[in-house]
Amino acid sequence: MSRYTGPRLKIIRRFGGLDLPGLTRKRPKNTNPPGMHGAERKKKSEYAIRLEEKQKVRLNYGVSERQMLRYMRKARRSKGSTGLALLQMLEMRLDCIVFRLGMAPTIPAARQLVSHGHIEVNGRKVTIPSYGCKVGDVITVRNKESSRKLVAAYAEYPGLFLPDYLEFDKEKLRGRIKELPPREQICAPVNELLVVEFYSRKL
């Protein structure tokens, strides 16, 4: 399954108006699921509930099903909570770090900044949105007028609050990762245990 590129507000409505900050900052006027028009909703099966949680993660972070499987395999090999390890790996993607630093209003916008060569990690240009950042990494905007103007405009209206595990100098457009993100500061409104259960039979 490829990355979703369709109408974003339709996705928000599908989940009953749930906030997916990585996907979009807009809010639908109508939070009823598309096509429901007030009809009574059927009770969801356990599989449907787990599938929905998995879809929330995929759509919030903009990852494909193949990428999700790869992250899940890595998370299962890690120590501690598999669900937390999964979310931390997604939060440490370069596109998500750029978003959480306030350099872009959404993760799709951050992905474009990275892929178009506007972002550097530890002084080197990185154009891979899925690049896995590490604690101590320094993320900066390339020293080009076009890059700095674009990010400076975004930084005036960040999509989310700056989490404690990051620091950001708005004047220098420079951020640093201080530590791994704790669960309470991860921007995914999901039950990660259900996501782990969904993939338990696939791995």
Swiss-Prot record:
Signal peptide limits: none
InterPro entries on file: Ribosomal_uS4, Ribosomal_uS4_bac-type, Ribosomal_uS4_CS, Ribosomal_uS4_N, S4_RNA-bd, S4_RNA-bd_sf
Protein origin, superkingdom: Bacteria
GO molecular function: rRNA binding; structural constituent of ribosome
Keywords, in A-Z order: Ribonucleoprotein, Ribosomal protein, RNA-binding, rRNA-binding
Family matches, as SMART domains: Ribosomal_S4, S4
Disulfide cysteine pairs (residue numbers): none
GO biological process: ribosomal small subunit biogenesis; translation
Oligomeric and partner information: Part of the 30S ribosomal subunit. Contacts protein S5. The interaction surface between S4 and S5 is involved in control of translational fidelity.
Function: One of the primary rRNA binding proteins, it binds directly to 16S rRNA where it nucleates assembly of the body of the 30S subunit.
PANTHER family reported in the protein's UniProt record: 30S 40S RIBOSOMAL PROTEIN, SMALL RIBOSOMAL SUBUNIT PROTEIN US4M
Family: Belongs to the universal ribosomal protein uS4 family.
Protein name: Small ribosomal subunit protein uS4
Organism: Synechococcus sp. (strain JA-3-3Ab) (Cyanobacteria bacterium Yellowstone A-Prime)
Lineage: Bacteria, Bacillati, Cyanobacteriota, Cyanophyceae, Synechococcales
